[in-house]
């Protein structure tokens, strides 16, 4: 084992001198024994000459001093993978943080792995049902595809991702991996407790590097989660679900260390390597002819600006986008999905079928027409509209409310029982509203219900 010495510490960035035997390779893990007996992992980032490397620390650098010995492990960070990580909670370097003792895993993977070769990639397009009306109808998710949930602060990204975990993990008996990247520790704790209660925990591996962690951990924890998912895909030939909350924090962590590594910032102060870092992560989240990785990623939108480089870079990699809108959240419609801004590559009659496609397009055109009329309504009022437009507005407002839905994970807040709506019920319900079967029902009957039958029942009580 090569041994070096710490020569400089600048926050999370540590420089190490290696006198003889050459330098560790880029991305190799180095370890430092702390005075309290714990081990700190550093990741090599740059060679600063013939004897010095610059590294990023995966944990706080408190207590480190110059001259401390550093050992080169000779390989990148290795994390435990396999069936034994299910039901466990790990940190970025694969150490357990759930207090249940060490993970007894026979195999470990590097967190930096090559992308699968082109000839083994799968090109199948198939929709998978989430039980959430607005998603299944207007921006269906594909099995083995990548989906992004975009939204500013406090519009419901984490609640939506929790609901998806709840619906998908319970309905489909596959394995899931959850990577908590730079988000609130409280939310991670809630998820852990909720999973234990619902019994989903035995099929899930959780990897956390939350807000309180140094940027090195936040920049790498998504890769740790991905390596665990890749094991199930490649060696057990399974369909795996990978949830990442939040991809923006991955970019943000990269930007935090970029300047300390001596790089010139690029647009809006982000790291110049933004596109490469995002590409290296997203390019590994693929499906092969052995198994699939279906990923759902929450993506924070700084100041509600979708053109910010961080969300804009993520957009290009996704198969479906669910955009959460503050204006819809203000109307009290949850999930606050913007039906006109959200997209999906598989909303195609050849994949989802003609009925689904036509219903989705009819819903979108009604909502678009309502949006166009809103200026007239605001200035002149409803009375100035033609009878046809009044009917359009009435149906569009019903559709808007029918796109809301009570969530299982939000039962404590709404006091309403969560609903899982099957795709055929979703299509049937929206078709009936478009065809005018429910023109006589009040708008409020459609708010926070599951199927159209529930809306009819609710109308009787109003």
Swiss-Prot record:
It is found in: Cell inner membrane. It catalyses: ATP + H2O + 4 H(+)(in) = ADP + phosphate + 5 H(+)(out). It comes from the Bacteria. GO terms for cellular component: plasma membrane; proton-transporting ATP synthase complex. Pfam families: ATP-synt_ab, ATP-synt_ab_N, ATP-synt_VA_C. It is a peripheral membrane protein. It is an enzyme of class 7 (translocase). Its EC number is 7.1.2.2. Keywords: ATP synthesis, ATP-binding, Cell inner membrane, Cell membrane, CF(1), Hydrogen ion transport, Ion transport, Membrane, Nucleotide-binding, Translocase, Transport. InterPro entries: AAA+_ATPase, ATP-synt_VA_C, ATP_synth_F1_bsu, ATPase_a/bsu_AS, ATPase_alpha/beta_chains, ATPase_F1/V1/A1_a/bsu_N, ATPase_F1/V1/A1_a/bsu_N_sf, ATPase_F1/V1/A1_a/bsu_nucl-bd. One of its GO terms (molecular function) is ATP hydrolysis activity. ATP binds at residues 151-158. Belongs to the ATPase alpha/beta chains family. F-type ATPases have 2 components, CF(1) - the catalytic core - and CF(0) - the membrane proton channel. CF(1) has five subunits: alpha(3), beta(3), gamma(1), delta(1), epsilon(1). CF(0) has four main subunits: a(1), b(1), b'(1) and c(9-12). Produces ATP from ADP in the presence of a proton gradient across the membrane. The catalytic sites are hosted primarily by the beta subunits. This is ATP synthase subunit beta. The lineage of its organism: Bacteria, Pseudomonadati, Chlorobiota, Chlorobiia, Chlorobiales.
